[in-house]
Amino acid sequence: RVQNNTMDINVNEIQSNLIEAARSWDDKLEQALSASFGEAEGNRLKNKYRQAFPRGYTEDVIPGSAVADIEQLEALSDDNRLGMLFYRAQEQGQDSNRVRLKLYHRAEPIHLSDVLPMLENLGLRVIGETPYEIDCGSETFWILDFSMLHPRGPLELDASQKRFQQAFAQIWNNQLEN
């Protein structure tokens, strides 16, 4: 109950919140692409990825993270068919032993049975995997998002991210034994 009806109401803040709530995921992605890549490149990417993301992806991934995924997908080529990002989710604290790995691939999916032994041999326990098929019409990409535990406690991600990604890539490309 409000005493004497003296509560201050910020009408501009309420309007701003309503406008933000009414914006679609695609609208937010378009804005994030323009902010990250500039208007011309943002428009090109918006047109390419406009209908590409499946519903599960748009429900699971915020538009700002989708921009990072698009950047990884755009870096793929015939010579560079695998991209990756080893990271800790924002909702996990630095002292968490949970880590994630996103694999990005062109044309065909990566099979769980190919990746699981590699991750386990690198000392991680896979507790979940979510695949996303990104269909841009003229080309198809795959994103596999792995959720994992490091059984010996938290990883110092800043120190281990680059080494992990290099080791995984070398194993994937048969330059190191699994």
PLM features per residue range, with description:
Residues 1-178:
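Non-catalytic interaction/regulatory segments
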